[in-house]
Amino acid sequence: MDLRTMTQSLVTLAEDNMAFFSSQGPGETARRLTGVFAGIREQALGLEPALGRLLSVAHLFDLDTETPANGYRSLVHTARCCLAHLLHKSRYVASNRRSIFFRTSHNLAELEAYLAALTQLRALAYYAQRLLTTNQPGRLFFEGDERVIADFLREYVTLHKGCFYGRCLGFQFTPAIRPFLQTISIGLVSFGEHYKRNETGISVTASSLFTDGRFAIDPELRGAEFERIIQNLDVHFWKAFWNITEIQVLSSLANMASTTVRVSRLLSLPPVAFEMPLTSDPELTVTISPPLAHTGPGPVLVRLISYDLREGQDSKELSSFVRSEGPRSLELRLRPQQAPRSRALVVHIHGGGFVAQTSKSHEPYLKSWAQELGAPILSIDYSLAPEAPFPRALEECFYAYCWAVKHCALLGSTGERICLAGDSAGGNLCFTVSLRAAAYGVRVPDGIMAAYPATMLQSTASPSRLLSLMDHLLPLSVLSKCVSTYAGAETEDHPDSDQKALGVMGLVQRDTALLLRDLRLGASSWLNSFLELGGQKSHLKSVSKTEPMRRSVSEAALTQPEGSLGTDSLKSLKLHDLGLRNSSDTTDTPELSLSAETLGPSAPSTINFLLGSEDGSEMSKAPEELNNKDRVRGVGAAFPEGFHPRRCSQGAMWMPLYSAPIVKNPSMSPLLAPDSMLQTLPPVHIVACALDPMLDDSVMFARRLRGLGQPVTLRVAEDLPHGFLSLAALCRETRQAAALCVERIRLILNLPGPPV
């Protein structure tokens, strides 16, 4: 169904439902249902033209006709998913509204949540139009005055996000992955609630189990808490949460479910300089020094994974590098039979935002790769920020890569074909390691496979970056915190002083007291939640402000008197919050308006983001599809008159926007590398996600390489989130996307295809 037909069908159903519920009397339920369908009608009619304009020019930003992918397309697709859900729900309401089994409160809550999401998506469409009229032709990232982009990003982060993490969580992704995303979001908000208490692992687990069931029962509460976490908690929280998979129990369970391999050994490479031959003249050598940045010389940890035990992998020389991991170190001694060395070698660099995870986190899919490719894999455990900011990780990865090239025989490979592979931050490091290898004059890999890589670390805007408003893994504030930490910016000290003061016994006593308290409060929370779901009213006379016992929106929104519903309520999406009332409604905080009247007239020396380039030569090069009407759209208000997106109730959020020269360094942002550097890269194969906030990183990097005549391919996985490699075993769609990565590596290594 095309966009216009979908919109017209939704508007027709909304008007029919409005007419029905407006005739049901003056009750609160009927009034709210009438209002929500009025809001759906208004937002759908306003959104359709904006999406149409984006879609009409989206093809100008594709890599080629065979790869229709960029942030504009992704934004339109996401809005279509929201419209499709509202269309389905509106049809359901129209068919069942007279039934005695019609769940009024549930359907109202879901309609309100998706109306809020549709309103925010409409705002994103207008932001995308502003980028379209301001960016240079064919460019997805904004390039210009840094003050302008800072103002744009600070304005963007004030948008309300909680609606995307409650009932609407993951609506844009494939249905098979949504239950997993819900589990992750519940775990994140539970983890966040106990994070600041400095609790030990057992206390966090027990507290989350008994007290945080309300996050599963109440989607609106979960969304509000998720929004609070992504705005207020520092990078140490995200580092701790993303490293949960490193816990021994969880990693053991993952290993039990993954492919069994003969070799999985952690190696420690000593910080010793060695010589490497130059590719231009093998008789000449260059010295590869050990990593030195920030902490001085130190060992580099790597993990060798091989499905078969191959020659060299049980040698005494390699064993001297082995770092014991317990029983797994005995695995080789039980299997003395050896296979010949493989022609191929894969050097892998894991992702994790430069701040989290290790090769152990990525071991499950690496084992599958080792089996499918029949080649050993060396995964690098580089040092993480904030303890080891840029360029420590790059130095360690380059050192480990050179060591692997020089000692490939010990790793079970002849080294005829070498592939660099990585995901996310690891993809970034794959590019920069190869650039450094070319600069040193040593052997570059035969190809690079980068899954959803980060190629632009500078704080800037692009259409796909707008998707971070609803992304569960890569909210813009989290991206900014990770990048600033990797760049070496000052971060808040991790609050561990209390733990040091208490000591071991003090921690045990404190955690015991907290656990008993949480058991007591948790039982009360669960009981009240289930009583409310059963329709019984419970009046809490005394509720702690730090741990509120909130009622679900399904009951509270329908039983609360009209006058007591605050305009800033997180539990009920009032119609005036969605821009359906005039601006005379009072609010606790003023609406942020980007109209010309609010911003005031621009002085000649002031750069106005809402205006196109004053230099007509730039815009004269734009394709005909970008007509004059689109170019001057920003001269008036940022949004149409009467439209006001929801703003964040958490107050103004501080987000570091780093534009220091270091983030423009090609070793941090390879997209900004000069042509002469990019021309030294080997064939590049990128596998991206259509709904990833970093999609434009992949598209623009591929476009740059293609423009230089460099061999590059781009494959885009549909309907999947960033990080799908770690979810490879979850569903058919993630398995297919992971198989696409393996197929790209196989192409680099010149390996035969898998048996049919």
Curated annotation (Swiss-Prot):
Gene Ontology biological process terms from the UniProt entry: cholesterol metabolic process; diacylglycerol catabolic process; ether lipid metabolic process; lipid catabolic process; termination of RNA polymerase I transcription; transcription initiation at RNA polymerase I promoter; triglyceride catabolic process
A UniProt-annotated Pfam family: HSL_N
This entry's Gene Ontology molecular function terms read: all-trans-retinyl-palmitate hydrolase, all-trans-retinol forming activity; diacylglycerol lipase activity; monoacylglycerol lipase activity; retinyl-palmitate esterase activity; rRNA primary transcript binding; sterol ester esterase activity; triacylglycerol lipase activity
Q: Where in the cell is it found?
A: Cell membrane; Membrane, Caveola; Cytoplasm, Cytosol; Lipid droplet
Q: Which SUPFAM superfamilies match?
A: alpha/beta-Hydrolases
PTM statement from Swiss-Prot or TrEMBL: Phosphorylation by AMPK reduces its translocation towards the lipid droplets.
Q: Which UniProt keywords apply?
A: Cell membrane, Cholesterol metabolism, Cytoplasm, Hydrolase, Lipid degradation, Lipid droplet, Lipid metabolism, Membrane, Phosphoprotein, Steroid metabolism, Sterol metabolism
Positions with biased composition (Polar residues): 581-596
Residue numbers spanned by region Disordered: 542-570, 581-600
Q: State the span of motif (Involved in the stabilization of the negatively charged intermediate by the formation of the oxyanion hole).
A: 350-352
The Gene Ontology CC terms held by the record are: caveola; cytoplasm; cytosol; lipid droplet; membrane; mitochondrion; nucleus
Q: Which residues form a coiled coil?
A: none
Reactions this protein catalyses = a diacylglycerol + H2O = a monoacylglycerol + a fatty acid + H(+); a triacylglycerol + H2O = a diacylglycerol + a fatty acid + H(+); a monoacylglycerol + H2O = glycerol + a fatty acid + H(+); Hydrolyzes glycerol monoesters of long-chain fatty acids
Q: What does this protein's UniProt record list under function?
A: Lipase with broad substrate specificity, catalyzing the hydrolysis of triacylglycerols (TAGs), diacylglycerols (DAGs), monoacylglycerols (MAGs), cholesteryl esters and retinyl esters. Shows a preferential hydrolysis of DAGs over TAGs and MAGs. Preferentially hydrolyzes fatty acid (FA) esters at the sn-3 position of the glycerol backbone in DAGs and FA esters at the sn-1 and sn-2 positions of the glycerol backbone in TAGs.
- Subunit organization: Monomer and homodimer. Interacts with CAVIN1 in the adipocyte cytoplasm. Interacts with PLIN5.
Protein's recorded name: Hormone-sensitive lipase
This protein's species is: Bos taurus (Bovine)
Gene encoding the protein:
LIPE
